[in-house]
Curated annotation (Swiss-Prot):
Sequence repeats lie at residues 127-210, 221-302. InterPro entries: Cyclin-like_dom, Cyclin-like_sf, TFIIB, TFIIB_arc, TFIIB_CS, TFIIB_cyclin, Znf_TFIIB. It holds the Pfam family Zn_Ribbon_TF. Belongs to the TFIIB family. GO terms for cellular component: transcription preinitiation complex. The gene is tfb. Gene3D superfamilies: 1.10.472.170, Cyclin-like (1.10.472.10). PROSITE patterns: TFIIB, ZF_TFIIB. SUPFAM superfamilies: Cyclin-like, Zinc beta-ribbon. SMART domains: CYCLIN (SM00385). It comes from Methanobrevibacter smithii (strain ATCC 35061 / DSM 861 / OCM 144 / PS). Keywords: Metal-binding, Repeat, Transcription, Transcription regulation, Zinc, Zinc-finger. This is Transcription initiation factor IIB. GO terms for biological process: transcription preinitiation complex assembly. GO terms for molecular function: DNA-binding transcription factor activity; TBP-class protein binding; zinc ion binding. The lineage of its organism: Archaea, Methanobacteriati, Methanobacteriota, Methanomada group, Methanobacteria.
Length: 310
């Protein structure tokens, strides 16, 4: 039976067995106990739309609500736009005598959407954020989180005296750490047209002023992405994570860059499993030097007594 969990106030417990798991079957207008099957109510009112749909395609066509609210657009996606195709609601062409009027309306409507200084700032910054996110291959959840951080910075008047690009980059870096989608400062700076130093300085400023608490980045967070880009197997990825966890237990990762530790662990795992990759390949993917790979490799193999040779 298709239905939803019934949560109305008038009946929350089955009078027969005492179960609180009640199912609302809107097709039959019944409320049924999921435990014993007792029909509790036969006059359930369907609060859904008045139209009917017999498959998903019809449902999509007849749904009249808009897109969900998103923080990645300056107006949160709540405003409307006049279509540029010069067609009315029924798909018919707009008469030629009215097209000049539609052009003027469209022009004014665009101006009205972005009228104030704050809206212009958000429109530019969020488009920049979307561009940087696309180049970094970040998921939508990270973009939403970064947009929230940037909006908080605007609301708290933290933008003045700083470049929009720098604040956007710092917001992205904070969102990546919050969502456990790690990206290095070098990667953020490369796509954001600001220096690594500025990104780091602005990031520290935002986290301090907005009281954002973020856990330190773990080398484990970088392993899946590096392993995928290197074409290593899932077994190699698991082995690298085991190596990192043992190293963390012994305190070998303290004061070490997480990308360097992750890269060295993956290199060791590739050697152990016969999926050998060159140090240059691993270093290029991780954004570290070959010297860093060799140093971390030596520390891990000696301290963990792994007995692996280059």
């Amino acid at each position: 039976m298709q239905g939803d969990v019934y949560d109305k106030d008038k009946q929350t417990v089955c009078p027969e067995c005492g179960s609180t798991e009640l199912i609302g079957d809107y097709e039959r207008a019944e409320v049924v106990c999921a435990h014993c099957g007792l029909v509790i109510d036969e006059n359930l009112v369907d609060m859904g739309p008045e139209w009917r749909a017999f498959d998903h395609e019809q449902r999509d066509k007849r749904t009249r609500v808009g897109a969900p609210i998103t923080y990645t657009i300056h107006d949160k996606g709540l405003s409307t736009m006049i279509d540029w195709r010069n067609k009315d609601i029924y798909g018919r062409d707009i008469p030629a005598r009215n097209r000049a009027q539609w052009y003027r309306l469209r022009k004014w409507q665009r101006k009205i959407r972005i009228s104030g200084a704050t809206e212009r700032n958000l429109a530019f910054a969020l488009s920049e954020l979307d561009r940087d996110s696309s180049r970094l291959g970040l998921p939508r959840s990270v973009r939403e989180a970064a947009s929230v951080v940037y909006r908080s910075a605007v609301d708290n008047k933290l933008i003045r005296g700083r470049s929009i690009e720098g604040v956007v980059a710092a917001s992205l870096y904070a969102a990546c750490r919050r969502c456990n989608v790690p990206r290095t400062l070098d990667e953020i700076a490369e796509v954001s047209r600001v220096t690594k130093k500025e990104v780091g300085r602005t990031y520290r400023f935002l986290t301090r002023e907005l009281n954002i608490k973020l856990p330190p980045t773990s080398p484990v967070d970088y392993v899946p992405r590096f392993a995928s880009e290197l074409g290593l197997s899932g077994e190699a990825q698991s082995r690298a994570i085991e190596i990192i966890e043992k190293a963390m237990e012994k305190g070998l990762t303290s004061g070490r860059g997480p990308t360097g530790v992750a890269a060295a662990a993956l290199y060791i795992a590739s050697v152990l499993l016969g999926e050998r990759k060159t140090q240059r390949d691993v270093a290029d993917i991780a954004g570290v030097t070959e010297v860093t790979i060799r140093n971390r490799y030596k520390e891990l193999t000696e301290q963990l007594e792994m007995g692996v040779t280059l």
